[in-house]
């Protein structure tokens, strides 16, 4: 659950790509920064980049305001190899207040509405992982 959004909706870990970093390097760094561990195997990455925009009424409620108006994302799927105790969202610069495992069938309804189309697209592209 995001710390900086008043809605109480959930979100998968995500983040930006730093200068001189490729998407694969970024996803490993972001995983470590946001959930405190990178004890996982990468099993799939999306074939496409997916865009979303944050609605202006939502931007007005966020502490970072208009600094980010949306994102273009490359998605990755991982198989976690560790123990649940390794997952710690109270990192140096926390973005989440709590975490949970979720069934993929319940994922979209728990996501902030403006990102639901993105999650629907990824669930379709990654559908073979859920059989």
Regions found by a protein language model. Give the residues of each.
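A short beta-loop-beta micro-motif enriched in histidine and acidic residues
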Residues: 92-96
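Short, charged, solvent-exposed linker or helix-capping segments at domain edges/interfaces
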Residues: 86-91, 111-113
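Short, well-ordered alpha-helical scaffold segment located
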Residues: 16, 82, 106-107
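Structured beta->alpha junctions
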Residues: 1-2, 16, 41, 111
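Charged phosphate-binding loop/patch that engages nucleotide di/tri-phosphates or the phosphate backbone
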Residues: 104-131
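N-terminal strand-loop-strand
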Residues: 1-12
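Active-site-adjacent beta-strand/loop module that shapes the phosphate/pyrophosphate-binding cleft
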Residues: 50-86, 100
């Amino acid at each position: 659950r995001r710390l900086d959004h008043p809605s109480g909706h959930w979100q998968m870990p995500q983040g930006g790509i730093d200068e001189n970093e490729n998407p694969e390097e970024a996803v490993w760094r972001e995983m470590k920064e946001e959930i405190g561990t990178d004890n996982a195997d990468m099993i799939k990455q999306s074939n496409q980049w997916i865009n979303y925009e944050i609605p202006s009424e939502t931007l007005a409620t966020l502490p970072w305001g208009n600094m980010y108006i949306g994102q273009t994302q490359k998605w990755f799927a991982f198989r976690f190899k560790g123990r649940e105790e390794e997952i710690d969202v109270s990192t140096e610069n926390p973005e989440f207040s709590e975490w949970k495992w979720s069934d993929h069938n319940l994922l979209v309804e728990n996501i902030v509405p403006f990102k639901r189309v993105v999650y629907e697209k990824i669930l379709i592209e990654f559908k073979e992982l859920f059989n």
